[in-house]
């Protein structure tokens, strides 16, 4: 965002290194970032079973450490990550150009990135009013697609007590296609 990496824009930034992510490990992994020393100390304690030092537990915690193999994979990938982002942005530009050339803008809403931002393009997601029909047609033509997060978070069982009116979300979950 405006030349800054997104994990440094708030008090705590988090990222996933799930294998399908642009900077993905070979297994589950993630990280949290902060510039606040006290928060950093608390975050380290939480991922070390709540330990302040060996066998001295000062808070509830869990085993949230990244294993050495995942760290090694990520360190290796991090060395070429800027080049990876350039390539991903190039592919996204090609998708956009081809869709503009071949598909009516009335049928498809393309993703946009503000001039002062860069995207890592974890997915290239469009909005299509007749998504399921388009998805079927693409599958028949051998083009793989995905619908990410088809059920809004506020409709998940864990949030059953929450009542929200999210009209834009309702529309999006019926239209998004990657």
What are these regions (language model features)?
Residues 9, 28, 124:
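Acidic, glycine-centered active-site loop in nucleotide-sugar glycosyltransferases
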Residues 29-34:
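Conserved RNP beta-strands of RNA recognition motif
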Residues 1-24, 53-58, 109:
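Conserved active-site segment immediately N-terminal to the catalytic lysine
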């Amino acid at each position: 965002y405006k030349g800054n990496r997104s994990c440094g824009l708030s008090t705590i930034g988090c990222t996933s290194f799930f294998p399908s992510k642009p900077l993905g490990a070979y297994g589950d992994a993630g990280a949290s970032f902060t510039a606040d020393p006290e928060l950093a100390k608390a975050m380290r304690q939480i991922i070390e079973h709540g330990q302040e030092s060996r066998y001295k537990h000062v808070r509830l915690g869990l085993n949230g450490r990244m294993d050495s193999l995942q760290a090694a994979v990520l360190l290796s990938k991090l060395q070429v990550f800027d080049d990876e982002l350039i390539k991903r942005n190039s592919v996204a530009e090609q998708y956009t150009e081809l869709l503009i050339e071949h598909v009516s803008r009335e049928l498809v809403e393309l993703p946009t990135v503000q001039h002062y931002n860069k995207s890592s393009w974890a997915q290239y997601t469009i909005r299509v009013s007749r998504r399921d029909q388009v998805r079927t047609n693409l599958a028949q033509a051998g083009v793989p697609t995905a619908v990410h997060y088809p059920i809004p978070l506020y409709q998940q069982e864990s949030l059953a007590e929450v009542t929200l009116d999210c009209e834009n979300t309702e529309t999006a979950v019926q239209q998004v296609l990657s």
